[in-house]
């Protein structure tokens, strides 16, 4: 009798515990993002909160850049009507040189973070490009560094980050690293041989050069 009563008491306690824990777990799982598509919102903002995103935009402008919203497209080597708009979007900071008109693009969270990122480290390291690159040297160099700017692998269709109203670069080759940090492929490639495009990012990235150059 005592064992039956004890068992009933334990089962009741377990049921009450589940009732208390389960709603809390569901609430946490749902998150606080009020956008229609939380996955796209997280992808677009990178690691930045909404407040930090606003600060990053202001920081970009303060450093002489221009906030540049871009959408991912596949098949950009084809006719524009055949381009395939993919999910998500990204905000870049575009730096354009007043002297020669050259540009460099940095994804906003990569620009604004004070922590190390693979893209910033790759920029600072100036790793020499190997002699094994064929075709597009910037895309090849991006792959050499451990990033990728390829849409669907090596193919004739192509792809990139698009801003149709941009007067300089409608389609951008952005080198994205495994930590999602991003700098454009040509900016990285030119910098590897000591050529500054757009702006010297030593004076723009909040994460400072660890190599002491």
Q: For the regions a protein language model found, what residue spans apply to each?
A:
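Signal peptide processing junction and immediate N-terminal pro/mature segment
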Residues: 21-35
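Mitochondrial intermembrane space
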Residues: 31-213
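Positively charged n-region of N-terminal signal peptides that target proteins for export
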Residues: 1-5
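Bacterial N-terminal signal peptides
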Residues: 10-21
